[in-house]
């Protein structure tokens, strides 16, 4: 049985986590076998949304209801997510990638290193240009940081240059990307990075 690469996607409510899973799957599933796990507090709404996009069939999506503390389900007690991973691997023994989307949470939420191999943390511009300056652990410790909805910057008075400067201050040389996922702006750069650094395509012969 192939051991899939597990990629965690975290971020606040409304930042674009589910859309990021959708877009990444859409562009990667021609080359890789993919499944997804979504975490919601009391519903399986994100799993339903992902299913409606058509990028994955129903048997490749599992919705996890985490209860009151979504960060606990991806870090302190990730048992429900481990069970979902096991179930997906039983259903499909050839998976290359499993995306694990966290429930919407605060800037301090991080994934257990036992649960995921890589993590992506996403915020959106509409939350304010000061968000990177707050230096939450999700932003600092994630392997990749995504600032989404750049198209909204003029409408909310956010300076992307300031956001980039603050991001560099906290992340140093760790990668970050500006995106407008709705129109797929900046998406290809993120995918290229993932192909090279997560899927190690450049090392494959």
Curated annotation (Swiss-Prot):
GO terms classed as biological process: urea catabolic process
Sample GO molecular function, one term: GTPase activity
Localization of this protein: Cytoplasm
Residues the record lists as binding GTP: 11-18
GO cellular component: cytoplasm
One Pfam family it belongs to: cobW
Domain of life: Bacteria
Keywords: Chaperone, Cytoplasm, GTP-binding, Nickel insertion, Nucleotide-binding
InterPro entries xref list: CobW/HypB/UreG_nucleotide-bd (IPR003495), P-loop_NTPase (IPR027417), UreG (IPR004400)
NCBIfam families (alphabetical): ureG
Protein family: Belongs to the SIMIBI class G3E GTPase family. UreG subfamily.
Function in brief: Facilitates the functional incorporation of the urease nickel metallocenter. This process requires GTP hydrolysis, probably effectuated by UreG.
Binding partners and assembly: Homodimer. UreD, UreF and UreG form a complex that acts as a GTP-hydrolysis-dependent molecular chaperone, activating the urease apoprotein by helping to assemble the nickel containing metallocenter of UreC. The UreE protein probably delivers the nickel.
Name of the molecule in the record: Urease accessory protein UreG
Species, as recorded: Bacillus cereus (strain ATCC 10987 / NRS 248)
Record gene name: ureG
């Amino acid at each position: 049985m192939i051991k899939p690469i597990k990629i965690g996607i975290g971020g606040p409510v409304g930042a674009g986590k589910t859309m990021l899973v959708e877009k990444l799957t859409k562009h990667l599933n021609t080359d890789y076998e993919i499944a997804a796990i979504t975490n919601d507090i009391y519903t399986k709404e994100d799993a339903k949304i992902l299913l409606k996009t058509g990028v994955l069939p129903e048997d490749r999506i599992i919705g996890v209801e985490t209860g009151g503390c979504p960060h606990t389900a991806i870090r302190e007690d990730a048992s429900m997510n481990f069970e979902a991973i096991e179930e997906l691997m039983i259903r499909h023994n050839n998976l290359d990638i499993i995306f694990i989307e966290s429930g919407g949470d605060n800037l301090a939420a991080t994934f257990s290193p036992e649960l995921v191999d890589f993590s992506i943390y996403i915020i959106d511009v509409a939350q304010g240009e000061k968000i990177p300056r707050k230096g939450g652990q999700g932003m600092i410790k994630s392997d990749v940081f995504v600032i989404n909805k750049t198209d909204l910057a003029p409408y909310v008075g956010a300076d992307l240059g300031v956001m980039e400067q603050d991001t560099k201050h906290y992340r140093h040389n760790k990668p970050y990307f500006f995106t407008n996922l709705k129109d797929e702006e900046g998406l290809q750069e993120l995918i290229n990075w993932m192909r090279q650094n997560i899927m190690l395509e450049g090392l494959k012969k």
